[in-house]
Amino acid sequence: MHLLSYIALITTLTQAVAMPAYNFASLPEVSPVDTPTQQRLDALAHKLHQFANSELKAQARERFASVTGQYGINAQFPTIQQDLDTSVDELAFSCLQKAINVGPLHPMVYSVLNPPRPSKQDGFMIPGGRYANDHPEQIYRTIPVNAKYDYVIRGKRTGGGPQDGGFTLINNHTAQSSVGAFPLRKLVVNTDGTFVLTLNATNSTAPNHVSIPSDAVSIMIRNTIADWKTQTPDYMEVEIVTPGVSAPSATEESIVNKARGYFSEAIPFYADFLLGNQTLTNPVNVIVQPTVSTAFRTVITQVSSFSHYNLSSTEALVITVQPGPSTYWILPSYRLFGISDNPWTRLSHLSS
């Protein structure tokens, strides 16, 4: 079976700073990820996920199959075709999730890039929204932002906290090119586990401040959980604090239209660029040297290697990782079209 491999080595600079006094209400004792906001957004995504996209899904399957065909891979092979169908369905749902939480005047913390999972609140199955080489041990959350406004993120760390992570500012919801970053190791946390980040366009050197570039549209928050017995993601909520600003909430029709637009953009980007130009163009069974990529969604403090392998049942591939100055590395393995195998039942990645 032809599979993809992606290795990331992350180097993070740390700086000792003091947390300024901040008086905020105690945060609710809820799941750090499955929050009431998350449940509300998941319910809306589930309601809208059958939006009229059959034509776009057909285009996506055809485009991905065309790309793999250029490299001698037959997408009509039953298991590959099944992988393709799953990947296209999840890519479509991920575009809907982006469209649901895209308004900088109505910012919410939304966990995305998840495998299919049941809703604990309402009992329905939430479709998977993985795409573009998700990391099974990453908790991904997004917040829409705009440099015109001021925001505050309030959070709380429980247990061991995450292994690694950070806040990456991106300027495009599809390509998700990095235009700024705040490494998690710079986050100053109070002794009770609480923390506050301020976000606006200023280049302040104050602790826990994130400067929003003029072209940023969203923050991708990553919490890496390497030891699921001791480490936990941080709880986070966001508030826009610019006075006197308001906007109507998005309608379901506008969300669906925006999702279709994101899907149309995603098809050539993830098929031609990520799968073809970034991955399959490399020699098979060779893990290429990691490089910095700002063109695709990788963190500014991260170097990455997009590679692919095709082994028989009697072959093995040995990969040697030399971490160098990196503080953390991960080696995930994916199905052909860039989503992880079932992380609940299969070993799909290794990390430091």
What would you call each of these model-derived segments?
Residues 1-21:
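Fungal secretory targeting signals
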Residues 19-352:
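A compositional/structural signature for long, glycine/proline-rich flexible linkers
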